[in-house]
């Protein structure tokens, strides 16, 4: 051995060790490792419905705010119905997968898992939702659906019960489809001007983050973190998002809607050694506190947005599902913790199902 090798081999060994750590497999937060709650031996009258028809057409959908002014805050009932009709198969898939994964993680019935895999496998084989002929509403549906599916999938993939161990070929097929959808989502939502980056971009980043962990793709993870930082740095000193304030009477509702994807991204990043909590002087914490205060007294939002706030969505407990990852990040206490416990359990199909089971299982068991 030469002197050069004798001197530098230990250093190279250390570099190799640390280099491996730097590229460790991506993981979800701890709660995703939970096993099946209690395996049931009966069939529970579970019936696997036929999978919704894979959507392979152009992602051209009417917006429910069609005809609204630039605030995009006035609902158009006719176009909303047209939107729901044309996207029915997609939302049926999203809701159905989240529901079946919830059921399987609770009961462990093989039929529940088989049905989930059949639905996802059917859409994966059709390469559904991959059209590059889309409008804004269409690309929005793509990323919402991806976040729903990947978010649910994570509970199967990382569960200590290892439900996918006997289904590796099908799992690989589905995950490759998720990865293709994520790559297209990155193309859909990259390089937007700052004035166009709003809650849609945050939801796109959440879908890519969930898929990054499901498929162990560091490039997708890095993109989601980058998009998170853009969002966090849009939050001003008072906890407002300027591009959501533009929504006038729905400004507070859209601030609340921006929180779930941001909180989930920060939670997943932290699980992988990237601590985003303090980004832009703890902007995510500031945003959450502002929304919680605004839900009780919306005057500050009304003053900033210039209109009285529509509080309909703020009265729905399920709209606060972001409290689960957010409280895990910032250690909620006192009144905020009480509000969270009062509203639990949180079940959001767009975030992959039952978040209380993932983030606060002791509370889930009391329900």
UniProtKB/Swiss-Prot annotation:
Q: Which CDD domains match?
A: AlgLyase
UniProt keyword Transferase, yes or no:
no
List, in alphabetical order, the GO biological process terms annotated in this UniProt record. alginic acid catabolic process
Q: Does the keyword Cell division apply?
A: no
Q: Record's GO cellular component, any one?
A: periplasmic space
Q: Where is the signal peptide?
A: 1-24
Residues noted as binding substrate in the record, renumbered to the chain: 63-64, 136-137, 254
Gene3D superfamilies per the UniProt record, alphabetical: Chondroitin AC/alginate lyase
Q: Which reaction does this chain catalyze?
A: Eliminative cleavage of alginate to give oligosaccharides with 4-deoxy-alpha-L-erythro-hex-4-enuronosyl groups at their non-reducing ends and beta-D-mannuronate at their reducing end
What EC numbers are recorded for this enzyme? 4.2.2.3
Q: Give UniProt keywords alphabetically.
A: Lyase, Periplasm, Signal
Please indicate which superkingdom the organism of origin belongs to.
Bacteria
Cellular location of this protein? Periplasm
Recall the GO molecular function terms of this protein's record.
poly(beta-D-mannuronate) lyase activity
The entry sums up its family as follows:
Belongs to the polysaccharide lyase 5 family.
Annotated function? Catalyzes the depolymerization of alginate by cleaving the beta-1,4 glycosidic bond between two adjacent sugar residues via a beta-elimination mechanism. May serve to degrade mislocalized alginate that is trapped in the periplasmic space.
Q: What name has this protein been given in UniProt?
A: Alginate lyase
